[in-house]
Protein backbone atom coordinates (compact mmCIF):
# COMPACT_ATOMS: atom_id res chain seq x y z
CA UNK A 1 0.00 0.00 0.00
CA UNK A 2 1.48 3.40 -0.98
CA UNK A 3 2.44 5.65 1.93
CA UNK A 4 2.39 9.41 1.69
CA UNK A 5 5.59 11.25 2.55
CA UNK A 6 3.51 13.55 4.75
CA UNK A 7 2.77 10.56 7.01
CA UNK A 8 6.45 10.19 7.93
CA UNK A 9 6.87 11.21 11.59
CA UNK A 10 9.80 11.46 14.00
CA UNK A 11 10.09 12.19 17.70
CA UNK A 12 13.46 13.84 18.30
CA UNK A 13 15.39 14.23 21.57
CA UNK A 14 18.93 15.58 21.15
CA UNK A 15 21.86 17.28 22.87
CA UNK A 16 20.76 20.57 21.31
CA UNK A 17 17.52 20.66 23.32
CA UNK A 18 18.11 18.51 26.41
CA UNK A 19 20.85 17.92 29.02
CA UNK A 20 23.30 15.24 27.90
CA UNK A 21 22.60 13.00 30.88
CA UNK A 22 18.89 13.05 30.02
CA UNK A 23 19.49 12.13 26.37
CA UNK A 24 22.13 9.54 27.24
CA UNK A 25 19.81 7.74 29.65
CA UNK A 26 17.84 6.39 26.66
CA UNK A 27 20.83 4.98 24.78
CA UNK A 28 20.51 1.61 26.51
CA UNK A 29 16.71 1.44 26.18
CA UNK A 30 16.40 0.67 22.48
CA UNK A 31 14.86 -2.74 23.16
CA UNK A 32 12.20 -1.19 25.41
CA UNK A 33 11.46 1.40 22.75
CA UNK A 34 10.78 -1.24 20.12
CA UNK A 35 8.52 -3.07 22.56
CA UNK A 36 6.28 -0.04 23.14
CA UNK A 37 6.11 0.69 19.40
CA UNK A 38 4.28 -2.55 18.68
CA UNK A 39 0.83 -1.79 17.39
CA UNK A 40 1.42 1.93 16.82
CA UNK A 41 3.71 1.80 13.76
CA UNK A 42 3.80 0.16 10.36
CA UNK A 43 7.52 0.84 10.11
CA UNK A 44 9.99 2.26 12.64
CA UNK A 45 13.68 2.87 13.28
CA UNK A 46 15.15 3.92 16.64
CA UNK A 47 18.41 5.91 16.51
CA UNK A 48 19.98 6.05 19.97
CA UNK A 49 23.43 7.46 20.80
CA UNK A 50 24.90 9.37 23.73
CA UNK A 51 23.82 12.59 22.00
CA UNK A 52 20.42 11.70 20.55
CA UNK A 53 17.35 9.50 20.91
CA UNK A 54 15.19 9.61 17.78
CA UNK A 55 12.26 7.48 16.65
CA UNK A 56 11.39 7.52 12.94
CA UNK A 57 8.10 5.96 11.88
CA UNK A 58 5.29 5.43 9.47
CA UNK A 59 2.82 5.70 12.31
CA UNK A 60 -0.55 4.37 13.25
CA UNK A 61 -2.90 6.05 15.67
CA UNK A 62 -1.30 6.72 19.04
CA UNK A 63 2.35 6.69 17.90
CA UNK A 64 3.33 10.15 19.15
CA UNK A 65 1.46 9.73 22.45
CA UNK A 66 3.16 6.36 23.02
CA UNK A 67 6.67 7.71 22.45
CA UNK A 68 6.00 10.81 24.55
CA UNK A 69 4.80 8.56 27.34
CA UNK A 70 7.97 6.47 27.04
CA UNK A 71 10.14 9.59 27.32
CA UNK A 72 8.38 10.67 30.51
CA UNK A 73 9.78 13.89 31.98
CA UNK A 74 12.25 14.10 29.10
CA UNK A 75 9.37 14.61 26.67
CA UNK A 76 9.37 18.35 27.44
CA UNK A 77 12.64 18.54 25.49
CA UNK A 78 11.36 16.53 22.52
CA UNK A 79 10.44 17.83 19.08
CA UNK A 80 7.98 16.23 16.66
CA UNK A 81 8.73 16.40 12.95
CA UNK A 82 6.64 15.44 9.93
CA UNK A 83 7.17 14.78 6.24
CA UNK A 84 10.05 16.58 4.57
CA UNK A 85 11.25 17.98 7.90
CA UNK A 86 11.94 14.39 8.99
CA UNK A 87 13.91 13.69 5.82
CA UNK A 88 15.94 16.89 6.12
CA UNK A 89 16.74 16.27 9.79
CA UNK A 90 17.91 12.68 9.25
CA UNK A 91 20.04 13.65 6.25
CA UNK A 92 21.66 16.45 8.29
CA UNK A 93 22.31 13.98 11.10
CA UNK A 94 23.99 11.52 8.71
CA UNK A 95 26.05 14.35 7.21
CA UNK A 96 27.41 15.30 10.65
CA UNK A 97 25.71 18.71 10.58
CA UNK A 98 23.69 18.03 13.72
CA UNK A 99 26.55 16.54 15.74
CA UNK A 100 28.06 18.19 18.81
CA UNK A 101 31.32 18.24 16.82
CA UNK A 102 30.51 19.21 13.24
CA UNK A 103 31.47 16.58 10.68
CA UNK A 104 32.21 13.74 13.09
CA UNK A 105 32.24 10.38 11.33
CA UNK A 106 30.87 8.02 13.96
CA UNK A 107 27.26 9.12 13.45
CA UNK A 108 27.20 7.77 9.88
CA UNK A 109 27.85 4.24 11.11
CA UNK A 110 25.33 4.71 13.90
CA UNK A 111 22.61 5.66 11.40
CA UNK A 112 23.38 2.60 9.28
CA UNK A 113 23.41 0.28 12.31
CA UNK A 114 20.13 1.72 13.61
CA UNK A 115 18.39 0.76 10.38
CA UNK A 116 19.99 -2.71 10.37
CA UNK A 117 18.76 -3.29 13.93
CA UNK A 118 15.23 -2.24 12.96
CA UNK A 119 15.36 -4.51 9.92
CA UNK A 120 16.57 -7.39 12.08
CA UNK A 121 13.58 -6.83 14.36
CA UNK A 122 11.24 -6.83 11.36
CA UNK A 123 9.94 -3.28 11.83
CA UNK A 124 11.80 -1.46 9.04
CA UNK A 125 10.12 -1.92 5.67
CA UNK A 126 10.76 -0.63 2.18
CA UNK A 127 9.85 2.99 2.89
CA UNK A 128 12.16 3.51 5.87
CA UNK A 129 14.68 1.34 4.03
CA UNK A 130 14.62 3.90 1.23
CA UNK A 131 14.85 6.79 3.71
CA UNK A 132 17.81 5.39 5.65
CA UNK A 133 19.74 4.10 2.63
CA UNK A 134 19.50 7.58 1.09
CA UNK A 135 20.51 9.15 4.41
CA UNK A 136 23.68 7.03 4.54
CA UNK A 137 24.35 7.83 0.88
CA UNK A 138 23.96 11.54 1.66
CA UNK A 139 26.38 11.30 4.57
CA UNK A 140 28.99 9.68 2.34
CA UNK A 141 28.46 12.21 -0.45
CA UNK A 142 28.89 15.15 1.94
CA UNK A 143 32.12 13.73 3.30
CA UNK A 144 33.53 12.93 -0.15
CA UNK A 145 32.61 16.27 -1.75
CA UNK A 146 33.42 18.61 1.13
CA UNK A 147 35.95 18.94 3.98
CA UNK A 148 33.25 18.73 6.64
CA UNK A 149 35.21 15.92 8.34
CA UNK A 150 38.63 17.49 7.79
CA UNK A 151 41.32 16.73 10.33
CA UNK A 152 40.85 15.41 13.83
CA UNK A 153 39.14 17.48 16.50
CA UNK A 154 40.07 15.23 19.40
CA UNK A 155 43.14 16.14 21.45
CA UNK A 156 44.90 12.81 20.67
CA UNK A 157 44.38 13.24 16.92
CA UNK A 158 45.49 16.87 17.00
CA UNK A 159 48.57 15.87 19.00
CA UNK A 160 49.52 13.29 16.38
CA UNK A 161 49.06 15.93 13.65
CA UNK A 162 51.41 18.34 15.44
CA UNK A 163 53.99 15.61 16.00
CA UNK A 164 53.79 14.42 12.39
CA UNK A 165 54.38 17.93 11.04
CA UNK A 166 57.27 18.59 13.43
CA UNK A 167 58.96 15.23 12.78
CA UNK A 168 58.30 15.09 9.04
CA UNK A 169 56.25 11.92 9.34
CA UNK A 170 56.56 8.75 11.41
CA UNK A 171 57.80 6.10 8.97
CA UNK A 172 61.12 4.69 10.08
CA UNK A 173 60.97 6.74 13.30
CA UNK A 174 60.95 5.58 16.92
CA UNK A 175 57.76 6.85 18.55
CA UNK A 176 57.39 6.60 22.33
CA UNK A 177 53.83 6.83 23.67
CA UNK A 178 53.68 7.56 27.40
CA UNK A 179 50.30 6.48 28.78
CA UNK A 180 48.17 3.47 27.83
CA UNK A 181 44.76 4.98 28.58
CA UNK A 182 42.17 6.01 26.00
CA UNK A 183 44.14 9.00 24.70
CA UNK A 184 47.40 7.06 24.53
CA UNK A 185 45.64 4.23 22.75
CA UNK A 186 44.21 6.60 20.12
CA UNK A 187 47.60 8.23 19.53
CA UNK A 188 49.41 4.90 19.20
CA UNK A 189 46.76 3.57 16.80
CA UNK A 190 46.91 6.69 14.62
CA UNK A 191 50.69 6.48 14.41
CA UNK A 192 50.53 2.82 13.39
CA UNK A 193 47.86 3.53 10.76
CA UNK A 194 50.04 6.23 9.23
CA UNK A 195 53.40 4.51 9.58
CA UNK A 196 53.66 0.73 9.13
CA UNK A 197 57.45 0.88 9.58
CA UNK A 198 57.54 3.02 12.73
CA UNK A 199 58.89 1.53 15.94
CA UNK A 200 56.33 2.17 18.68
CA UNK A 201 57.16 1.88 22.37
CA UNK A 202 54.34 2.02 24.93
CA UNK A 203 55.33 3.25 28.39
CA UNK A 204 52.92 2.99 31.31
CA UNK A 205 52.88 2.71 35.08
CA UNK A 206 51.08 -0.64 34.65
CA UNK A 207 53.21 -2.75 32.33
CA UNK A 208 50.27 -5.12 31.76
CA UNK A 209 48.22 -2.28 30.25
CA UNK A 210 51.24 -1.27 28.20
CA UNK A 211 51.50 -4.84 26.88
CA UNK A 212 47.80 -4.88 26.01
CA UNK A 213 48.09 -1.72 23.92
CA UNK A 214 51.43 -2.74 22.42
CA UNK A 215 49.82 -5.95 21.20
CA UNK A 216 47.23 -3.94 19.27
CA UNK A 217 49.72 -1.65 17.53
CA UNK A 218 52.64 -4.07 17.02
CA UNK A 219 54.69 -2.20 19.59
CA UNK A 220 56.86 -2.86 22.64
CA UNK A 221 55.79 -2.44 26.27
CA UNK A 222 57.78 -0.85 29.10
CA UNK A 223 57.38 0.48 32.62
CA UNK A 224 58.07 4.10 33.61
CA UNK A 225 61.52 3.15 34.87
CA UNK A 226 62.63 2.66 31.25
CA UNK A 227 61.76 6.22 30.19
CA UNK A 228 65.32 7.70 30.29
CA UNK A 229 66.69 4.93 28.08
CA UNK A 230 63.75 5.11 25.65
CA UNK A 231 63.94 8.92 25.37
CA UNK A 232 67.59 8.66 24.40
CA UNK A 233 66.61 6.50 21.39
CA UNK A 234 63.34 8.25 20.48
CA UNK A 235 62.46 10.57 17.62
CA UNK A 236 58.95 11.43 18.80
CA UNK A 237 57.35 11.32 22.26
CA UNK A 238 53.57 11.51 22.72
CA UNK A 239 52.37 11.93 26.30
CA UNK A 240 48.90 11.49 27.82
CA UNK A 241 48.94 10.63 31.52
CA UNK A 242 47.24 11.73 34.73
CA UNK A 243 49.92 12.68 37.24
CA UNK A 244 50.53 15.16 40.05
CA UNK A 245 54.10 15.87 38.98
CA UNK A 246 56.01 15.53 35.70
CA UNK A 247 57.10 12.02 34.71
CA UNK A 248 59.52 13.34 32.08
CA UNK A 249 62.18 15.42 33.83
CA UNK A 250 64.11 18.22 32.17
CA UNK A 251 67.32 16.34 32.87
CA UNK A 252 66.06 13.35 30.85
CA UNK A 253 65.52 15.57 27.83
CA UNK A 254 68.88 17.31 28.21
CA UNK A 255 70.60 13.92 28.26
CA UNK A 256 69.12 13.09 24.84
CA UNK A 257 71.56 15.55 23.27
CA UNK A 258 69.78 15.72 19.89
CA UNK A 259 66.57 16.97 18.30
CA UNK A 260 63.45 15.41 19.81
CA UNK A 261 59.73 16.05 19.20
CA UNK A 262 57.55 15.98 22.33
CA UNK A 263 53.78 16.56 22.37
CA UNK A 264 52.12 16.44 25.79
CA UNK A 265 48.31 16.56 26.18
CA UNK A 266 48.38 15.78 29.89
CA UNK A 267 46.65 18.18 32.28
CA UNK A 268 48.59 19.18 34.31
CA UNK A 269 51.62 18.81 32.00
CA UNK A 270 53.68 15.65 32.45
CA UNK A 271 56.86 17.20 31.02
CA UNK A 272 58.96 19.38 33.31
CA UNK A 273 59.44 23.00 32.25
CA UNK A 274 61.41 24.84 30.96
CA UNK A 275 62.06 22.76 27.86
CA UNK A 276 65.66 22.33 26.62
CA UNK A 277 66.54 23.93 23.27
CA UNK A 278 67.08 20.57 21.56
CA UNK A 279 63.39 19.67 22.04
CA UNK A 280 60.39 20.73 19.96
CA UNK A 281 57.61 20.86 22.54
CA UNK A 282 53.85 21.28 22.14
CA UNK A 283 51.47 21.29 25.08
CA UNK A 284 47.71 21.23 25.52
CA UNK A 285 47.31 24.89 24.48
CA UNK A 286 49.10 24.20 21.19
CA UNK A 287 46.88 21.18 20.60
CA UNK A 288 43.75 23.21 21.33
CA UNK A 289 44.89 25.78 18.78
CA UNK A 290 45.12 23.03 16.15
CA UNK A 291 41.63 21.84 17.07
CA UNK A 292 40.25 25.37 16.60
CA UNK A 293 41.92 25.60 13.19
CA UNK A 294 40.41 22.26 12.15
CA UNK A 295 36.96 23.30 13.35
CA UNK A 296 37.25 26.57 11.42
CA UNK A 297 37.85 24.60 8.22
CA UNK A 298 34.84 22.39 8.93
CA UNK A 299 32.58 25.35 9.67
CA UNK A 300 33.54 26.95 6.35
CA UNK A 301 32.35 23.77 4.63
CA UNK A 302 28.88 23.84 6.19
CA UNK A 303 27.16 25.77 3.34
CA UNK A 304 28.51 23.27 0.78
CA UNK A 305 27.36 20.36 2.92
CA UNK A 306 23.92 21.87 3.38
CA UNK A 307 23.55 22.35 -0.38
CA UNK A 308 24.29 18.66 -0.95
CA UNK A 309 21.79 17.71 1.76
CA UNK A 310 19.08 19.78 0.06
CA UNK A 311 19.83 18.13 -3.30
CA UNK A 312 19.47 14.71 -1.72
CA UNK A 313 16.30 15.69 0.14
CA UNK A 314 14.74 16.65 -3.20
CA UNK A 315 15.92 13.37 -4.72
CA UNK A 316 14.43 11.38 -1.84
CA UNK A 317 11.08 13.06 -2.41
CA UNK A 318 11.11 11.95 -6.05
CA UNK A 319 12.14 8.40 -5.16
CA UNK A 320 9.46 8.18 -2.45
CA UNK A 321 6.75 9.42 -4.81
CA UNK A 322 7.89 7.04 -7.55
CA UNK A 323 7.76 4.13 -5.12
CA UNK A 324 4.25 5.13 -4.12
CA UNK A 325 3.22 5.41 -7.77
CA UNK A 326 4.69 1.98 -8.54
CA UNK A 327 2.73 0.46 -5.67
CA UNK A 328 -0.49 2.15 -6.78
CA UNK A 329 0.06 0.91 -10.33
CA UNK A 330 0.71 -2.59 -8.98
CA UNK A 331 -2.65 -2.47 -7.16
CA UNK A 332 -4.41 -1.44 -10.36
CA UNK A 333 -2.60 -4.12 -12.38
CA UNK A 334 -3.55 -6.80 -9.85
CA UNK A 335 -7.18 -5.86 -10.27
CA UNK A 336 -6.93 -5.67 -14.07
CA UNK A 337 -5.15 -9.02 -14.33
CA UNK A 338 -7.71 -10.67 -12.08
CA UNK A 339 -10.62 -9.37 -14.17
CA UNK A 340 -8.82 -10.27 -17.39
CA UNK A 341 -8.13 -13.83 -16.20
CA UNK A 342 -11.76 -14.31 -15.27
CA UNK A 343 -13.00 -12.96 -18.59
CA UNK A 344 -10.43 -14.93 -20.61
CA UNK A 345 -11.38 -18.16 -18.86
CA UNK A 346 -15.03 -17.54 -19.68
CA UNK A 347 -14.18 -16.70 -23.30
CA UNK A 348 -11.99 -19.80 -23.69
CA UNK A 349 -14.75 -21.97 -22.28
CA UNK A 350 -17.25 -20.59 -24.79
CA UNK A 351 -14.86 -20.91 -27.73
CA UNK A 352 -14.10 -24.51 -26.86
CA UNK A 353 -17.82 -25.16 -26.91
CA UNK A 354 -17.91 -23.75 -30.42
CA UNK A 355 -15.13 -26.10 -31.53
CA UNK A 356 -12.41 -23.46 -31.87
CA UNK A 357 -8.93 -25.08 -32.05
CA UNK A 358 -6.15 -24.64 -29.47
CA UNK A 359 -4.09 -22.21 -31.56
CA UNK A 360 -7.00 -19.80 -31.77
CA UNK A 361 -7.47 -20.01 -28.00
CA UNK A 362 -3.84 -18.96 -27.47
CA UNK A 363 -4.36 -16.02 -29.81
CA UNK A 364 -7.44 -14.98 -27.83
CA UNK A 365 -5.53 -15.09 -24.55
CA UNK A 366 -2.61 -13.09 -26.00
CA UNK A 367 -5.06 -10.54 -27.39
CA UNK A 368 -6.66 -10.10 -23.96
CA UNK A 369 -3.28 -9.45 -22.30
CA UNK A 370 -2.31 -6.94 -24.98
CA UNK A 371 -5.66 -5.14 -24.79
CA UNK A 372 -5.44 -4.85 -21.00
CA UNK A 373 -1.99 -3.26 -21.14
CA UNK A 374 -3.04 -0.80 -23.84
CA UNK A 375 -6.18 0.21 -21.96
CA UNK A 376 -4.19 0.80 -18.76
CA UNK A 377 -1.28 2.64 -20.39
CA UNK A 378 -2.83 6.14 -20.05
CA UNK A 379 -3.56 5.45 -16.38
CA UNK A 380 0.01 4.26 -15.78
CA UNK A 381 1.42 7.36 -17.47
CA UNK A 382 -0.88 9.51 -15.36
CA UNK A 383 0.32 7.72 -12.23
CA UNK A 384 3.96 8.54 -12.94
CA UNK A 385 3.12 12.14 -13.79
CA UNK A 386 1.09 12.44 -10.59
CA UNK A 387 4.04 11.10 -8.61
CA UNK A 388 6.43 13.63 -10.13
CA UNK A 389 3.97 16.42 -9.34
CA UNK A 390 3.49 15.17 -5.79
CA UNK A 391 -0.18 14.25 -6.34
CA UNK A 392 0.16 10.85 -4.71
CA UNK A 393 -2.90 11.23 -2.47
CA UNK A 394 -5.25 11.32 -5.48
CA UNK A 395 -3.48 8.34 -6.98
CA UNK A 396 -3.85 6.46 -3.71
CA UNK A 397 -7.60 7.13 -3.78
CA UNK A 398 -7.78 5.56 -7.24
CA UNK A 399 -5.67 2.59 -6.14
CA UNK A 400 -7.89 2.11 -3.08
CA UNK A 401 -10.97 1.86 -5.28
CA UNK A 402 -9.30 -0.85 -7.34
CA UNK A 403 -8.17 -2.57 -4.14
CA UNK A 404 -11.70 -2.55 -2.75
CA UNK A 405 -13.13 -3.85 -6.01
CA UNK A 406 -10.56 -6.65 -6.12
CA UNK A 407 -11.42 -7.65 -2.56
CA UNK A 408 -15.11 -7.66 -3.48
CA UNK A 409 -14.51 -9.91 -6.49
CA UNK A 410 -12.41 -12.32 -4.42
CA UNK A 411 -15.30 -12.78 -2.03
UniProtKB/Swiss-Prot annotation:
It comes from the Archaea. One of its GO terms (molecular function) is NADP binding. The active site is at 50 (nucleophile). Homodimer. Belongs to the glutamyl-tRNA reductase family. Possesses an unusual extended V-shaped dimeric structure with each monomer consisting of three distinct domains arranged along a curved 'spinal' alpha-helix. The N-terminal catalytic domain specifically recognizes the glutamate moiety of the substrate. The second domain is the NADPH-binding domain, and the third C-terminal domain is responsible for dimerization. This is Glutamyl-tRNA reductase. It comes from Hyperthermus butylicus (strain DSM 5456 / JCM 9403 / PLM1-5).
Amino acid sequence: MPRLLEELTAVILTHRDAPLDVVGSFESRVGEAYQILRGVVDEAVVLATCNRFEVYALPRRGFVETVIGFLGEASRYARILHGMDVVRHLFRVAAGLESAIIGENEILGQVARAYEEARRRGVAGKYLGLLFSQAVRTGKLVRSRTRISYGNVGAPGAAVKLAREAAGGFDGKHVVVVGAGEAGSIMASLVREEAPTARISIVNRSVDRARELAGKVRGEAYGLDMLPKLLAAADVVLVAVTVNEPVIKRSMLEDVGRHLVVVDISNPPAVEQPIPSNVYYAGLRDVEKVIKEVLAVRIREVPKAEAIVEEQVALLRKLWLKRGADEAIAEIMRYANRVMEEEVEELVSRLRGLGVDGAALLVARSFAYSLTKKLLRPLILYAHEAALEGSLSKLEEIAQKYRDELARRQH
